[in-house]
Amino acid sequence: MNNAVASRRAFLKLAATVTAAEFLQPEFTAGALRANAANALPEATSPDYTLRIAAAPIEIAPNHIVSAITYNGQFPGPLLRFKEGRQVVVDVHNDTDTPEQLHWHGQFVPVDVDGAAEEGTPFIPAHGMRRLVFTPRPAGLRFYHTHNRGGADLHAGQYSGQVGPVYIEPTRDSGGYDREVFLVLKEFEPSLSRGGDMAMDFLAPATEDKTLKEAGESAMKESLAKGTPHGYEVGYRYFTINGRMLGHGEPVRVKTGERVLFHVLNGSATEIRSLALPSHTFKVIALDGNPVPVPVNVPVLWLGTAERISAIVEMKHPGVWVMGDLADDDRSHGMGIVIEYAGQPGKPQWIKPKPFHWNYARFGKTGNTSPAPDETIDILFFKRNAALEGFNEWTINDVAFSMEKPAPMFHVRQGRRYRLRMRNASDDIHPIHLHRHSFELIKLAGQATAGIMKDVVMVGGYQEVEVDFVADNPGLTLFHCHQQLHMDYGFMALFDYV
């Protein structure tokens, strides 16, 4: 996506351009082979899209270049636009020396194309190719990214540049906007430190569970009393939107009276991001690509890792503005983009917004109007400080996930509705993701809500969050914190269908 603005006309031109690629049969597990064979297309069929995974330079500012593994030599990867319910073919070439996974985040796809080794998805072999055939759904803003482990290698996994947006066109478009702008937020040049996490208090409700807090703080105090330092955390040197630092990319040019639909993706490996546009508000119409029951105007957007927000901004305050992160240091190091009204001269202006707390429930139905679950599953998150060679180890119900023994922890039956009661005994905010399904938000730190469908939810420090999902997509299903540093060190679990 070289241009932030994607018009419908540009989409039609893009959709008409396809690249032929030779079909290469990958190595499969037996189950994945059967699933893929059912969707196989003739060798001569041209793909709808072709993606190439390879190292490439990214010019984040004039004469300032970083190197990263990317899709098609660019960051972010190309915008892929699909039609809901219409089968697509994507050829993925891996030009690196490392087997790769490409995860279709937020889509209801089968295991063999989901892109997670933990579920058994075949790897895209080094210097090889896989042809992926699937039916895109549900409609809305999704994305694709690597699902490889990073660990201590801060050039691998989601620390790399392997992130790209997906927009699945609904069968019916409600309209209400003049054009779309896609923004991908991403940091580069990560490094390790032992400073500990910086407290963030933007989530509402702010209610903490005393039992969870006592357990988490007690464990941390005990660890520090033994002389153990804080576990490693990741920080970054450069911050970008669409691969360019603030002031060094093309501005988003607008006209007075335009209604611009911004599709915002937090493509970070580890960071929670905020976004504000002075003198304007965002009318949030979708979270993680799913329409919200109650669209609401807000002054600030908050996005956990891998979250997406679609919001309409009415351009009615002419000027040249900075749309940027609330954190002054992050914004000064690049996390922003210029919004420029036609005919308006001058330097971009930033005005810090008033304090604002992010509450998912403001976009939902009031009260608990959702169906009762068939079963409730209790899930406890816990941190073992610096337990793995200086890195924090994370557990779900006292078990740290292991790829050597990836046994399913939870068992579900098709067609049943399950409530996940997630309890966070750490002070970290965890963006929790469930593969191949969406879930409904039910309760947020004691506050009931309904109707909000997501595939990532931020679970606040020492808080409890409840979500419901329907087991309607058989196969192994990965559940994890989307912070690379957490999922690499135990914060994952598998569901299976029985």
Residue ranges and their predicted role:
Residues 2-5, 15-18, 22-305, 311, ...:
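Histidine-centered copper-binding motifs that mark active-site loops
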Residues 141-143, 261, 320-322, 419, ...:
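Short, conserved beta-strand segments of beta-strand-rich sandwich/propeller modules, principally
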Residues 152-153, 319-340, 482, 487-490:
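Terminal connector regions
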Residues 263-267, 273-278, 311-314, 322-328, ...:
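A structural feature that tracks compact, well-ordered secondary-structure segments
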Residues 278-291, 397-399, 425-452, 484-488, ...:
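Active/binding-pocket-proximal capping segment
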Residues 377, 383-389, 396-397, 401-427:
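C-terminal structural cap/anchor segments
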Residues 441-472:
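C-terminal soluble interaction/assembly domains
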Residues 460-498:
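TerminUS-proximal long segments
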